[in-house]
C-alpha cells in the first residue's frame, strides 16, 4: 500500500470493521471476550463462550481479517488478543464515539432479554443513547428515574436496560482504553425543539 493511500484505506477499513462488529452480535461478543481476557486460545474461547470449535476458528479468523484481533503464531497453541477499536462520527456537528463498551453491550444483547428487546424494537442507536445514561447511572451520578425518563422508555423497561448496561459499564471501565470517550448524558442534555 502506498503512503499516499494508507491513511484513507486504513480509516475506511477501520470503519467497516467497526460496522461489522455492530452488525453481528456473535462477533461483538467474541471481540469483547478477548478484550476482557487479554490473550486467549481457541480452547478458552470455546469453553467460556460455549460455542463450537469450528465457529470459534471461523469467527476468530474473521476478526483477524478485520484487524480487530491479532493472532500470535509464535507458540504451538495460537493465542489471540484484541486490538482496541474506536470510531468517532460527526453528523451535523453532533459527535459520537463508538468504543469497545458499545460493542460489548451489543454483543450481550442476544443473551440479555432487555438489551435484545431494546435493540430489536428501537435499534442500535437507542442502545448507544442508553449507554450514555448508563455511565453516570452506574457511577452513582444519575438516578435511574432520571435516566429512564430521559431515555423516553417505559419506566420499568428503562430501569431494566440501565441495570443490564450497568454491568457492561462496570466490566468494561477498566478494560476499554477509550472508555473516557463515551459521551456522558449529563454533559449533553437532550435537544429541545424550538
Spans of model-derived segments:
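N-terminal leader segment of winged-helix/HTH proteins
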Residues: 1-18, 173
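A short, conserved structural fragment
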Residues: 64-74, 167-176
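Short amphipathic alpha-helical interface segments
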Residues: 26-39, 126-139
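Short acidic, hydrophobic short linear motifs in intrinsically disordered regions
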Residues: 38-48, 143-146
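Short, cationic-aromatic polyanion-contact patches
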Residues: 12-27, 41, 74-95, 183-193
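Amphipathic alpha-helical dimerization/coiled-coil segments
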Residues: 90-129, 136
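Alpha-helical residues within the helix-turn-helix
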Residues: 47, 65, 149
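Short amphipathic alpha-helical interaction segments
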Residues: 51-62, 154-163
